Amino acid sequence: MKTIIIGLLIPFAGTTAGAACVFALKKELESGVQRALTGFAAGVMVAASIWSLIVPAIEQSDRLGRFAFLPAFAGFWFGILFLLALDHVIPHLHRSIDQTDQVEGLKSGLSRTIMLILAVTLHNIPEGMAVGVVYAGLLYGSANITAGGALALALGIAIQNFPEGAIISMPLYAEGKSKPKSFWLGVLSGAVEPVFGGLTVLVASLVVPAMPYLLSFAAGAMLYVVVEELIPEMSEGEHSNIGVIFFAIGFSLMMALDVALG
């Protein structure tokens, strides 16, 4: 159980470390740097969705023969629809590279800062679920999930959480909030990951046979975030290939981690 708890906290540590950048850097991240970091995060999430979630989901359903894809197919779509629903219900704000704000979700009287944090929190939910379901598979003896593979996913999510923590804390500081407050708000945006990770472990204990569905559910939710949010963000502004290059770096790094440790 100690291994599970540590694994669930590793991604949160990445967010915390990234938010701490507000104490070391003196100004807001440049648009090119933001595109690079967003592309990197997208690459990690796509690779994690494929190698750590969808592939194990299909492998665990091999008893179905040629229909082994069905649990992964169904879980993937449930994940997409779940995030689509949250995206339309939770009031949140997307900040573009050109500093314009795009409000999504139900109308509310929430402050701009809260909605910005909710935007990051929204896509931290599937990341926490992804780590939680993999560690649940490890805990309940899924043959296709190893301790190394679970650690690889946790480390990969932590690595891509580092820039996310910086991207939330530094703009808040640039807008006039104190460094400590900006840091803690950045940390708060990542606190949902261990919470949803723990909840996923508990849910999985009740429905162990549904593990392939849970794995692909997390993958669908993560890929929704990539396509709906991260890819558009890394492509904003003047034409640049920096986002694509760092997407490839993030993808290859996560793939290497999964194969080497898994």
Predicted regions and their residues:
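Intrinsically disordered, metal-sensing/regulatory segments
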Residues: M1-G262
